[in-house]
Curated annotation (Swiss-Prot):
Keywords: Lyase, Pyridoxal phosphate. This is Glutamate decarboxylase B. Homohexamer. The modification N6-(pyridoxal phosphate)lysine is found at K272. Its EC number is 4.1.1.15. The gene is gadB. PANTHER family: GLUTAMATE DECARBOXYLASE. The keyword Lyase applies. Gene3D superfamilies: 3.90.1150.160, 4.10.280.50, Type I PLP-dependent aspartate aminotransferase-like (Major domain). It comes from Dictyostelium discoideum (Social amoeba). InterPro entries: Glutamate_decarboxylase, PyrdxlP-dep_de-COase, PyrdxlP-dep_Trfase, PyrdxlP-dep_Trfase_major.
Length: 463
């Protein structure tokens, strides 16, 4: 073993006189020798300064404003593995409480008779909901002696997890394209696409592209009528990744959840408007019978018998405990105050953007998710001196991260920008953002762009 002379005086003096910081470190392979932990921590934290400021990240749906108690909970739970329910029985009990709270929040007919599970996020939760649809449809087809080799789902413009689900599990996705003036699915378009092989219809409560809600109520009514005429019973799974923690508090008049008998399952993201740290999603079934028993595995090699349904295995427990903390801390009234405050900022920004006379609002912040979505008006007297990719790039120089992207499929020629308003975004910040947008427009007027950014250069669509 080689001997190394350590200059203790230098190592104790300053992090920035040690070799780990004065020389190039190994970045793509494991170094031979260890380093002082504080020096390496400092080096990494310096690199992370190049990341964007999360408070100004208006592109993400994920929660970035977390109180000190959540940080403490996450620290205390860093070693808890949620799959080890026999070793961490109280953590498992807390997970169970969260599921029943959600079942009650989403108006399950009997929240004590429902079933569900936590996940790493709403994408995994959505896939589990989709798998349950497939298994139930396949069993029904087998009982009737009918073929079951061509399952399909009918969706609006969905988040990419549904395309992954369709590809990974060999299911046809019938995605209803947007049209000018219609950016979400509606019941008429659904009925054009459903048939005996449709395992489920997947409306989204908060479409990623525009923040709008799809009308679960009218879709359910249309499927009721379709069943009376055809005898084909098609269930609904609601992708409420964002809206599942918004609509129950500030849009209670919207009927989208288990109040509709056709809604068999709902997924949501705890780390979006559920106010929890990254890494927790939820899926809840209307009744236990809606989750096919063949999808549930029973394992006993962790010290006790337990049931599991997931696409992974080991998972940290801190996010689930933090979700429970949020439920207890905020309650219904607290969540209502928070989500309404977010919604008001979105409405304010929408009104201010409209006043500028250059933008058309696709979504003005009312009636769905907190935020706003806009495009450059096509009715301007002359061509604008910039595009939305240019605007996003200019705003980035002030620290703002704004998602700009083209809409999918048949609306691909329409470029939009979107901001999502999350807990922790004040009216003061909203006003500063609007001012920076106005300043950017004035800058482009004084300094015309010779070549605007193209889609592949400027698109920054954050799911």
């Amino acid at each position: 073993m080689p001997l190394h002379i350590v200059d203790k005086h230098k190592s104790l003096y300053d992090n920035y006189v040690q070799s780990a910081t004065t020389e190039e470190i190994a970045k793509f392979k494991l170094a031979d020798d260890p380093n002082e932990p504080e020096t390496i921590k400092k080096l990494i934290m310096d690199e992370l300064l190049l990341d964007g400021n999360s408070k100004q990240n208006l592109a993400t749906f994920c929660q970035t404003d977390l109180d000190k108690n959540i940080h403490s909970i996450m620290d205390k739970c860093i070693d808890k593995n949620m799959i080890d329910k026999d070793e961490y029985p109280q953590s498992a009990e807390i997970e169970n409480r969260c599921l029943h709270i959600l079942a009650d929040l989403w108006n399950a007919p009997d929240s004590s008779d429902t079933i569900g599970c936590s996940t790493t996020g709403s994408s995994e939760a959505a896939m589990l909901g989709g798998l349950a649809l497939k298994w139930n449809w396949r069993e029904n087809r087998k009982k009737l002696g009918l073929p079951y080799d061509k399952p399909n789902i009918v969706t609006g413009p969905v988040q990419i997890c549904w395309h992954k689900f369709a590809l990974y599990f060999d299911i046809e996705i019938r995605e209803i394209p947007m049209e000018n003036g219609r950016y979400v699915m509606n019941s008429e378009e659904v009925l054009k696409r459903v048939d005996e092989n449709t395992i489920g219809v997947i409306p989204t409560l908060g479409v990623t592209f525009t923040l709008q809600y799809e009308d679960v109520f009218s879709i359910s009514n249309a499927l009721d009528k379709f069943e009376k005429e055809s005898g084909i019973n098609i269930p609904i799974h609601v992708d409420a990744a964002s809206g599942g923690f918004v609509a129950p508090f500030i849009q209670q008049e919207i009927i989208w959840d288990f109040r509709l008998p056709r809604v068999k399952s709902i997924n949501a993201s705890g780390h979006k408007f559920g106010l929890s740290p990254l890494g927790v999603g939820w899926v809840v079934w209307r009744e236990k019978k809606d989750l096919h028993k063949d999808l549930v595995f029973n394992v006993n090699y962790l010290g006790g018998n337990m049931s599991t349904f997931s696409l992974n295995f080991s998972r940290p427990g801190g996010q689930i405990i933090a979700q429970y903390y949020n439920f207890l801390r905020h309650g219904r009234n607290g969540y209502t105050l928070i989500q309404d405050a977010c919604a008001q900022q979105g409405i304010f920004i929408g009104k201010e953007l409209k006043k500028m006379g250059i933008f058309d609002l696709i979504y003005d912040g009312t009636g769905a998710l907190p935020g706003v979505c806009w495009t450059i008006s096509k009715n301007l007297p002359s061509e604008p001196l910039f595009n939305l990719y240019d605007l996003s790039e200019k705003l980035r120089s002030r620290g703002w991260q704004v998602a700009s992207y083209s809409l999918p499929s048949s609306m691909n020629d329409v470029v939009v920008s979107r901001v999502v308003i999350r807990h922790g975004f004040s009216r003061d910040l909203s006003s500063l953002f609007v001012k920076d947008v106005q300043n950017a427009i004035e800058y482009f007027q004084k300094h015309p762009i010779l070549r605007s950014l193209e889609k592949d250069e400027g698109e920054n669509f954050h799911h």
